[in-house]
Amino acid sequence: MKIGNYQLKNKLIVAPMAGVTDRPFRELCLRYGAGMAVSEMMSSNPQLWKTSKSKQRMVHEGESGIRSVQIAGSDPQLMADAAQFSVENGAQIIDINMGCPAKKVNKKLAGSALLKYPDIIEQILKAVVDAVDVPVTLKTRTGWDTENKNCIHIAKLAEDCGIQALALHGRTKACMYKGEAEYDSIKAVKQAVSIPVIANGDIDSPEKAKYVLEYTGADALMIGRPAQGRPWIFQEIHHYLENGTTMPELPIEEVKSIMLGHVQALHEFYGEYLGPRIARKHVGWYLKEHEQASEFRRTFNAIDAAMLQLEALEGYFDNVAS
């Protein structure tokens, strides 16, 4: 699949997730089979660009793979400015967020709250496309609620505005992440536009990935929450799509190596104070299916020092293997 002039190495894309798809996580997913990774959402409000954490996350020069940066907001000019800023800092693709259902985003009329206002959507899309000379993509949902699904209209509008690919989550804004994603809307959008369509929502296994691709006719898949604590899911899905067979479960030693490497990367990226705190949620995701890990997770979450976190993880896996 191509987005503009960029050829993805496969059909599997890491979904942008606030507080999750930072540089260490994106690099890890790319290493384990993802064809592209989209950065976590960046606000179009320049006042929020000044924190050290934001500045650190905004620099994309030197990253592996195709660098896609997601921006969010409701003011067309601020969105255009954010797109230009991102390109100046290494973005090769700009992704516009109109899919996030979070209240703190929606109350600012950003994310999926915009689905009620196609006129504003059109202004934003045109402003961003005109502001940069890189491909612009859009991530959105099927509609405001189940009675107001307007994804076909939004998809056609996006295509007319110059959007070069569309990622569609199979839920409405009102659904948040409840219930199950539906794929009929994605199938209908794929049939309605000629730009690439990327299916998103509940793609949590190789078999589900194959089903969604075949049912919707989508050009690619976007995977978010199922990759938390399992970044190798992209490798598993790619193998299944190519060969029709499932890979064996990763040996515990390889899981240990991946997790320790990820935690070390977080420590190095965020520093001695913030790194261990961010590592906690990732370790929780890695160990969520380990029945014996509940007590360890509580202990681990109380550890503030980077070196002590690594020692604790070594000890945990030594006990599991013994």
Curated annotation (Swiss-Prot):
It catalyses: a 5,6-dihydrouridine in tRNA + NAD(+) = a uridine in tRNA + NADH + H(+); a 5,6-dihydrouridine in tRNA + NADP(+) = a uridine in tRNA + NADPH + H(+). Disulfide bonds: none annotated. Its EC number is 1.3.1.-. Keywords: Flavoprotein, FMN, NADP, Oxidoreductase, RNA-binding, tRNA processing, tRNA-binding. Pfam families: Dus. It comes from the Bacteria. InterPro entries: Aldolase_TIM (IPR013785), DUS-like_FMN-bd (IPR035587), DUS_fam (IPR001269), DusB (IPR032887), DusB-like (IPR004652), tRNA-dHydroUridine_Synthase_C (IPR024036), tRNA_hU_synthase_CS (IPR018517). FMN binds at residues 16-18, 70, 139, 200-202, 224-225. Gene3D superfamilies: Aldolase class I, Putative flavin oxidoreducatase, domain 2. One of its GO terms (molecular function) is tRNA dihydrouridine synthase activity. Its cofactor is FMN. The active site is at residue 100. Catalyzes the synthesis of 5,6-dihydrouridine (D), a modified base found in the D-loop of most tRNAs, via the reduction of the C5-C6 double bond in target uridines. Belongs to the Dus family. DusB subfamily. HAMAP family: DusB_subfam (MF_02042). This is tRNA-dihydrouridine synthase B. It comes from Vibrio vulnificus (strain CMCP6). The gene is dusB.
